[in-house]
Amino acid sequence: MQNNEEPYSKTRNSGQHPSGVHTKKSPRLPKCARCRNHGYASPLKGHKRYCMWRDCQCKKCSLIAERQRVMAAQVALRRQQAQEEELGISHPIHLPIAAELLIKKEHGGSSSCLMLENSSTQTTSTPTSGSTASSEGKVLIQEIPSITSRGHMESTSDLVMDSPYYSNFYQPPLYPYYNNLYNYPPYQMAMAAESTSGNDMGGISGPPLKNNHRNHPAAYVPSQSGNQWQMKNRENRFPGHSGSSQFRMHSYYPPYLGQSVPNPACVPPFLTFEEIPSYSEAKASVLSPPSSQDSGVISLSSNSPVSNESTKAVAEQEPNSESSLFTVTTAAENGE
């Protein structure tokens, strides 16, 4: 080895200049390490392909190759960490451990038991180095928000039971007082309601007139669209209006139908003006007392003399219902 180093030392000494002669140092040029190990000094630039000891397997050259592999691995690791920091991913090495813990949580009974199991496994496991201990601490930090964020992880059946409530939130089964979303007949836009006897009578006649105007269904409200009033019997009653008058609610009509704008062209009359009895008979049948069990279909067209103004006048007489009924019945008897 001494003989090999001699020419290298000679070339090195020959390249030096006396201190008093040169005023500026020459730039340092990297030399080939493999050639240096074998006693030759050759510049590294453009020499890698043509190096004579490129495939040398001696001890020094093998150490050089191992060092190059380690440095390449470190560079690749630094690039990977930089990319993960840009993407917001932290600790990629511990992801399989976190996935196993999540699988244990899903198959376990409750979150408290899972926390105890995880803590027991981590206390029993002896860390071999400081890096493993720090990784376990990081996994513990990642477990806590995962358990709190999941909320009801104790039983997944609760989530399955809650899903139909949110999916069928506006469906008819949740609202027993409504037949459909708008609650109007599909073929005729006449305002419909039932005519029953006793306390089931929800119309404008009888003792329910003493209650507030909110108890009247939308079939008897004169401000709705059209002048036709339709009364259905018990066989054709709607399922949404089967309750008593105090539990009934208004039927909803969409705003595009209009409120107080009659449209006789779109709503065909149920009966003609000739088929309807006289004015007094129609008024007596509409304002009949609750004791009379008049069932059937009575529809007043837009050409009938009973207009919205007369119905509004009748609706305004709610405080004096008994006196108004008495005067109406006497007027009907005098007319007959």
Curated annotation (Swiss-Prot):
It is found in: Nucleus. GO terms for biological process: cell differentiation; male gonad development; male sex determination; male sex differentiation; positive regulation of DNA-templated transcription; regulation of transcription by RNA polymerase II; sex differentiation. Keywords: Activator, Developmental protein, Differentiation, DNA-binding, Metal-binding, Nucleus, Repressor, Sexual differentiation, Transcription, Transcription regulation, Zinc. GO terms for cellular component: nucleus. Its main location: nucleus. It comes from the Eukaryota. Transcription factor that plays a key role in male sex determination and differentiation by controlling testis development and germ cell proliferation. Acts both as a transcription repressor and activator. This is Doublesex- and mab-3-related transcription factor 1A. The lineage of its organism: Eukaryota, Metazoa, Chordata, Craniata, Vertebrata. The gene is dmrt1-a.
